[in-house]
From Swiss-Prot:
Disulfide bonds: none annotated. Pfam families: EVE. HAMAP family: UPF0310. Belongs to the UPF0310 family. This is UPF0310 protein SSA_0254. SUPFAM superfamilies: PUA domain-like. It comes from Streptococcus sanguinis (strain SK36).
């Protein structure tokens, strides 16, 4: 059964993942990544542009499909070897501001989970956000 997830990551880091065809969540932890299975979908929510920056973004910034079966490690720099998963990202998309998503009836249920960095959402919620992100969507005409 296909499941749908949100990962909370700065936009700067999301863009690295999109460019490289991978995802990382929760500062490279393995457990959250292994909750996802091949064929699951991931939406990235970016509270800020940069991890240590002050400028807020508060938007959904990428959407993709998990391609592999398990998390693997990659050394990004000496002493930091995070886990990641391979992802096929849907492109092009536009950022979807949180204000658009707050209209969805399930938003209140998910809003409090953002602080956990990675959590499952319903297919209906996922599709609602995804539709807002697609450039060719009637929602964006």
């Amino acid at each position: 059964m296909t499941r749908f997830w949100i990962g909370v990551v700065s936009k700067e880091h999301v863009l690295r993942g999109v460019e490289g065809g991978f995802c990382q969540v929760c500062h490279g932890k393995k457990a959250p990544l292994n909750r996802m299975k091949k064929g699951d979908y991931l939406l990235y929510y970016s509270p800020k542009y940069q991890l240590n920056g002050q400028e807020k973004l508060q938007a959904f910034t990428a959407v993709g499909k998990i391609l592999d079966d398990t998390a693997y490690q990659v050394e990004m720099f000496e002493g930091f070897v995070p886990f990641r998963r391979d992802v096929s990202y849907y492109q092009p998309v536009k950022d979807c501001p949180i204000e658009q998503v707050r209209q969805h009836p399930q938003w209140r249920q998910y809003a409090s989970q953002i602080r956990y960095g990675h959590f499952e959402v319903s297919k209906d919620f996922f599709l609602y956000v995804f539709e807002q992100m697609k450039l060719d969507s009637p929602a964006n005409q």
